[in-house]
Amino acid sequence: MALSKLDNLYRAVILDHSSAPRHAGELKQACVIDMNNPTCGDVIRLTVDFTEDKISDIAFSGHGCTISTASASMMTEAVIGKTKEEALELAAIFSQMVTGHTDSAQERLGDGQFLAGVSKFPQRVKCSTLAWNALKKAIEADGTATVSESH
């Protein structure tokens, strides 16, 4: 069965973010969150710099599957420059989307909306939400802590 042009576009965007992730690396002066997905081996270190209530810079490192890496890249693009509240709203929209609850708000995710198809593969939901959950932990830590945990 041939993929439709739209499916090909989604696949190309996901592969692009996975092979050339945006905001890859680590920030020196930032909140550090280490998380892993023990079911598949994905590991992420998210570093977030908050200036007042906004995400002024963000970066991630680690290793993971295509979905995990692409999602982290897409998340960093979506939340940089956003307030903590806006970032949490985007995380909630993303979580709803990858569990099959879609609405027009997912357009706010930018390229992240291309991961909506993950909802068809429940075993991949944790891969797609790892970076977003790390972001939530960074915001909950009020940008001052180093947190390590499993997802």
Model feature map: region roles:
Residues M1-K28, K82-H151:
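C-terminal binding/interaction regions
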Residues A20-G62:
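Structured beta-strand/loop patches that form or line metal/cofactor-binding pockets in enzymes
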Residues C40, I67, K120-R124:
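Secondary-structure capping and boundary motifs in well-ordered enzyme cores
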Residues S71-T83:
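Alpha-helical support elements that line or immediately flank enzyme active sites
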